[in-house]
Amino acid sequence: MGRTSPSVEGANDLLEVQVSRIYLSCMEMVREVERDLWEMGINVEVQSMQDKQARFMTKEVRAYSFSIVPSIAGHFDVGDMNRMVDYVFPNSTVVEYCEAEIKDRTSEKILNPGNSHKVRNQVWSEFLHDGKFAYTYSERITPQLMTILKELRDKPGTRQAIINIHSNFFMTPGSWSGNPDVGDELDLDRIGGKKRIPCSMYYQLMRRNEALELIYTMRSCDYLTHFPVDIWLAIAMQEFAAGWLGLKCGPFHYFTGSLHAYEKDMKARGIF
């Protein structure tokens, strides 16, 4: 059977799906991503945001992806990464936050609330309940990290080196974090504004061409609050893993189901 032509509405929807680009720097990437969002994003109203049940207007692009290649030396320029963060958060301490957070994530200690939130308290304080967060990346990464790195060391061709962040499956209390005082729950039970759930789905690490690549998959990302931070931290994780394995870095690959910005934040920047 011949392929039927999409409806006008369907064709318009297809236009929102972007072709993946390859960038030579984080700064080049963050500017182009911003332009794509402002010029090609569509207005979408959502009914909850993390642990808030309320209506919010956003601008969104879907199924968005890109890659960034490292330098010829096989590493990403930290100065370039920092400039990317400063581009979205000028005159702030967000780079300092990133530096503290990657230490929490790679400390091999299960930390909640950890240390980094103190640097960016204006964002994170509202999510603290009885002195803890609903989850931390440290809690979710730490029990997996060394096992994944050893697998990459012993089986260079593996496609199974995935560090899961988001989890819809059930675990007994404490089994995810390794801490019996931390009650684990289904992320599925937290949806709809009940509690925070991770925007990140997983990191996939792959050894190819004598270098370590990282594929970062997210369900959702807020450009004006978290995007450059998430990219900085993922690349820093790639550098950490490459260093542990004695490898150079290969390309960094990114995909998100929804890249968006909230009307309230865009108005503050004079955009919406």
Please state what every model-predicted region is:
Residues 2-272:
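Terminal, non-catalytic protein-protein interaction segments that mediate quaternary/complex assembly
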